[in-house]
Each structure stands twice: as structure tokens, then as C-alpha cells.
UniProtKB/Swiss-Prot annotation:
The chain crosses the membrane at residues 521-541. This is Pheromone-processing carboxypeptidase KEX1. The gene is KEX1. It is an enzyme of class 3 (hydrolase). Keywords: Apoptosis, Carboxypeptidase, Glycoprotein, Golgi apparatus, Hydrolase, Membrane, Protease, Signal, Transmembrane, Transmembrane helix.
Amino acid sequence: MGFSETRAYSAWGAWSTWLTICLALANLLPVTAKSAADYFVDSLPGQPEGPLVKMHAGHIEINPETSGNFFFWHFANSHIADKPRTIVWLNGGPGCSSEDGALMEIGPYRVTDDHMLNRTDGSWDEFANLLFVDQPVGTGFSYVSTGAYVSELDEMTSQFVTFMEKWFELFPHYEKDDLYFAGESYAGQYIPYIARAILDRNKKESVQAQNRQWNLKGLLIGNGWISPRHQYLSYLPYAYREGIIQGGTDASLRVEATISKCMKKLNVEDTTGTIHIADCEDILQTIVDETHKGNRCINMYDIRLTDAYSACGMNWPPDLKNIEPYLRYKNVTEALHINSDKQTGWTECSGAVGGNFRALKSKPSVELLPRLLEEGLPILLFSGQKDLICNHMGTEDMIKDMKWSGGTGFELSPGVWAPRQDWTFEGDSAGFYQQARNLTYVLFYNASHMVPFDYPRRTRDMLDKFIGVDITDIGGNPADSRIGGEKGPTTSVGGHPNSTTAAEREKEKMKSAAWKAYYKSGEVALIVVAIAAIIWGVFIWRSRRQKLRNPSHEYRGIYPMLGSSSSGSLPRFSNKRGRSADDVEAADFDETELDERPSRAVSSRSSREHEPYAIGEEDGSDREGEGSDERRRLVDKS
């Protein structure tokens, strides 16, 4: 090796050493922590005109060892009635995304067929901040290392409390809000467990020393999977009542045989499998199979509808066909700050999560409710009348058997039960209320498994009553909501002057007024043209008569005194009527301009070939194998 080569080699060796040292030092430097600003969503594809609801979204790591990350989507309240409130919403499954709640139920926007966003009349963000969370890990936009799924409720709870602590570190100004948890279906297991953990956390000296207690004020659970025993045994009575199965038929005998197998499991003293019992799950499957005719079957989430067999409700609600492609567009995932580590596109429910979450060592959440109520925590349970999978009869039977605060069920005193009070909303019979000792039950008539999807305004009225919103000091037009004939606290559901929906209605009124003015101006123009035509006709008629009387005189047009200029009068009039670019009225009221969408609209795609925004294929585990089979077997209680 020559001198120059040796020197070059030595120089490279020194440089390599320095590079190694620099990289090592860089690894020792702390990674810059994210701030709230990193999660700010400044725009969304397809957003409606006007200001966007203030929102933040993204991932928070809750388990570095397994790369476990929760996805959240937070919407700030539109107005504060008397004090700040935050509602955490969870969907069920297990393994179903809370974007269902955000975009089909209580959130401020819903996705249209052309993937635009429309404001929801009755959304829950009017007087409360909304926090939607995809959990357990692997649900929706949340993700985790393969095989590291959650299987028990205690583990789920621990991860969720970790998430809340980290979320409040990012957004400390919300930590002292009145805090509520709401959700539906299998969230009936999640929510009581999380509530118990929060109350226990608040008692810790370390938490109290830092003044970091969370102001948990209440729980709302819709069509909840809370007491599996009561729910399993309610399926056939509900099917009889609704005419799904006829008594004394071969179909009823087949269902009763399945119930007998379930009862053997329920009567065995066993500390495992009390939340998910395969033999008992078969009851619902058998009922649904008995409705199979042709290629259709009953929709287990809304018995008024049917679905393709063997989905039997899995394709419902209809908005789902709009949401999945919308949440897979690249510009949407970028707007929501979806990490690149999330390899697969959004799916509503994860078969892998549901298949692992059996909770075989967990006790049903119904066993937690009495103590929560006795500690003074208000709880509201509500049910849609036309839901089969988590039907209202199971919830009502559970309440009737539950003991707390010295009474059973809705007892006011021994043998005296709280009455069911009829509820009317805006003149319609909406359902009934029943209340006693911190527990409220609401039945919604003609509603499905997802009550807010059917009745956003009614559920908002229910919410405002429960959390204590009273618009008396705010002003506005109160909603006509009566329980037992009495109005109670005044709620607005978008009727107060500063509400978002009121502003939207005012905008529609202004647009309608503009169109009326346009049509009115058109009518006036038509009258003017008609009068001009009559005058024209009179002049023509008189000119012809004059020519007939004086054949020696040449016809010189309408204006005989103007000479040759008369020949240009009609063309100029015609040109005025046929104007385009110079027509101020036409420019102001061009229908195509009024119907024009914002330029950021996401266009629907007719085929995979024209979908450049897709960010990944569906998770195979969600569509086939055990996970898919469990969805067909109706495990998912979203």
C-alpha cells in the first residue's frame, strides 16, 4: 500500500470513528416530545363551508414494548353552558372502532355518499368536548405488535388509564373538566371497569398530592352488553314478543334446545367464561338462522330490516359504506396524523382483536355497577327498542334483579317501584324514563342498536338532561321535551341563538331567501318582457294599418323618425336578452355556482384502478379465519 493510499485509509478511519461517536451521542439525546400543536387538525377533506370544528387527532403510545398505540380524535365544544365538560366515547365489539360513534352517531359530522362532510343536527359537541378512542390496541386506527392483543378487562383498563394520563399531559387544560364516559354495546363492559379504576386512582395519595384527580361525574351506556346471563336468556322472549319466532313451532323448539345447553353452562359454578359463553352465543345464532329465507336474514341490530345472509346486520348502518373509503384516503389519514407504523387501512371491526378478547378471567361488569351507584356516581342506561343483539328486555331484567343502596331494582320503598314516565319530544312519543337511587333508564321507541344514529336530537336532549345543561341563562328556543308531562330543565338541541346548528339553519334561510329573490326578479323580468311584447305588437299593428292606409309610404320600422337607425333597434334588444358574460343578474344567480362544492372535496372512485389514496389492504385476519368466523357468529357487539 502506497503512502497516499495509507493516508487516505487513515483519514477514512478517523472520519468513521467520529461518525460512530456522533451517532452514539445522538441516540442518547432525548426525542423531542410531541405537543398538542402536533395533533391539531387544521382541515379535513370534504369539510363543509364555514369554520371547522376545533379538533385534534393522532396516536399516543401506551406500551413501548409492544408498540401499542391508541388513536384518539378530539372535538372541542362549540359552547360552554355553565362549566366545561368532556365526554369520552367508546364503541364495543370488542374490537370495533369509535369512529363509528364519531361519524355515524354523536360526532359533529357525517359522511355523505360523495364523501363530503355534513354537520349533524343534534351532535353532542354543542356543550361538551368529545374524545373518541380506538381501543383495545389493534382496534380501528390503533395498532400493536402482532400477537400482543389484550385478552382481559383488567389489562384493557390499565392501558386505558395510561392513555388518559398521557392525554391529559398533552392537554392539561381539560383535566379539571367534568368527565363523563359514554358508549354502547360491549362498551358496557369497558366503561364500568374504567370508572372503577378512575375512582380508585383518585384515592391514591400520590394523585391527591399533585391535585391530579379526575372529576368523574357520570356514565352513559346504550344497548349495553353488561350482564351476559340476562342478555342470553332474553333472546327468545324478545323474539316471541316481536314476532321473530312463533311459539310451538319447530323453530322455537330448536331455539329452546340451544337454551338448554346454555343453562347447563350458566348453572355450573365456574369462575371462567362468564362474559363470553360459546354455548349461549349459539342462542342468537340459532334465532337469526331461523329467519334465513332466500339470501336474506333479519338484521340483528334493527329487526325492522333484513340483510344479506350471513351478514345479518354486519353491513349496517348504511353510512358504513361511506366511512370506510373516506377513512382510507391518504389525505384523510394525513390530516388525522395517522402514524406510518399503522400498516393496514381502517376497518370498522378487527377480527383479531375480537378473537383474542375473551375475558375468560374477568367478571361481568354488572357486578361493578352496585358499588359505583352507592358511591354516588350517576349512571344512565338507554336502549333502542328494535335491537335484538343487546335487547332492552335483557337490560330491564338485569335492573330488576340488581341490588344497591338498600333496594332492589327501581324500588322506592319495599314493594313500591319508580313509575315509568312517558317521554315526548317535540310532540312525538319518544319512549319512557325510569329513575331511582342514581340509576336512570331510558327506552327509545322505534330505535336500533345505535340509538344516536336514528335519533341524534333526542339523544342530545337526553344527554343535556343527564349532565345538567340548562339554557335558561343562555337564552334561546327551548326544545319541547316532557317527562311525565313535565318540562324539567330547559334544553335547546340547537335552538339557542349561538348554537352551531342554529347558525347552519340561518345560513339555509339566507340561501332560500336569495333564491326567492332570484325567482321574484325573474317574475318581474317576465312581466316587463310581456309588456314590451304587447307594446311591440301594438306598434307593429298600427304601422301596418298606416301602411295599408297610405300604400305610397315605405315602412320604416317602429320609429319612423329615426331613419336607418331603426334597423339596429331589434338586434340590440336581442343582444341584451342573450348576454352572458356581461349579464350581472345571470352571474349573481348562476345555479351551477350555487351548487358548486369546495375544491378540497374527495371524489368517489369507481374502481380500485382509480384509487390512488388507499393506504393499505384490509387486515387479512379481520376477513378470514377465526376472526371472520367470530364476526359471523355475532360476537361483535359494536
